[in-house]
């Protein structure tokens, strides 16, 4: 008997689609409106065209924030992805310890971002923090509130602690989806662990690793709460990433025109980089 397909199933999700579109389109149009105007009190607006876009794109402040953002994203991806895969490979696939390991890996992801920043702010203080006292006890002058290198080290370490678990869980799900027949065939061929990883595990994990890298890229490129609570963008502007700089311009200086233009440029950069990255990953997978 031929199954009948219900062609109007989309009607059930239409309200949600309209709600999401409504919540996204109106704020976006508001930002576009501010990005081409100069605003004054009493709802007085003057048309400025692309003036704010030119100002942002030619701003050394924007260039410096963008470079810091790209450097931070590159560093944490180079650390978190290999580390997450290594931890996933070390985790048991069967037995009572599976649940224990999964719960431990999920715990950092359940902590709110502002709490993570506050925790690491206390943890890294040179006078009372466990991390700060331990590093200073080794004879290394460490103070993330005054030293840009120490602030970067602490910010990267905090992000690695908070988000490597996401890569671990996704990589572990990919490993668990590999049929046992592959491992049995490798055992018959006396394959070494490196060969098993290279020819069996890594190819089977490509799709989940693509998702993990894409998620971590987008999240790290838009990071705000943790570094802002930890360092406030300092010392100086050493940890002022694009998101922090955008908030300072919009809410600190109340320059709505440049802030709106910068937010749209920011959005387009994230969208473009994600599209390029995803296209390259999918092309490599097809090949």
Q: Could you describe each region identified by the protein language model?
A:
Residues 4-287:
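A structural signal for multi-pass alpha-helical bundles of membrane permease subunits
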């Amino acid at each position: 008997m031929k199954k009948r397909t219900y062609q109007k199933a989309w009607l059930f999700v239409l309200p949600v689609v309209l709600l999401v579109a409504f919540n996204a389109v109106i704020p976006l149009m508001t930002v576009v409106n501010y990005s081409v105007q100069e605003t004054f009190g009493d709802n007085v607006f003057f048309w400025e065209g692309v003036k704010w876009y030119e100002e942002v794109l030619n701003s050394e402040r924007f260039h410096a924030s963008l470079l810091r953002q790209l450097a931070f994203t590159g560093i944490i991806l180079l650390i978190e992805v290999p580390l997450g895969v290594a931890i996933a490979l070390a985790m048991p696939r069967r037995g009572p310890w599976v649940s224990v390991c999964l719960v431990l890996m999920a715990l950092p992801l359940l902590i709110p971002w502002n709490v993570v920043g506050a925790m690491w702010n206390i943890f890294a203080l040179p006078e009372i923090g466990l991390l700060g006292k331990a590093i200073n006890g080794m004879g290394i002058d460490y103070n993330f509130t005054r030293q840009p290198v120490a602030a970067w080290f602490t910010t990267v370490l905090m992000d690695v602690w908070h988000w490597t678990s996401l890569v671990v869980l996704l990589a572990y799900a990919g490993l668990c989806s590999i049929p046992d027949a592959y491992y049995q065939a490798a055992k018959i061929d006396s394959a070494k662990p490196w060969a098993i990883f290279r020819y069996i595990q890594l190819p089977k994990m490509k799709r989940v690793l693509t998702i993990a890298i894409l998620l971590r890229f987008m999240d790290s490129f838009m990071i705000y709460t943790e570094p802002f609570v930890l360092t406030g963008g300092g010392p100086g502007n050493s940890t002022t990433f694009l998101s922090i700089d955008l908030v300072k311009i919009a809410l600190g200086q109340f320059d709505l025109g440049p802030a709106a233009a910068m937010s749209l440029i920011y959005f387009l950069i994230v969208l473009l980089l994600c599209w390029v990255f995803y296209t390259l990953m999918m092309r490599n997978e097809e090949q």
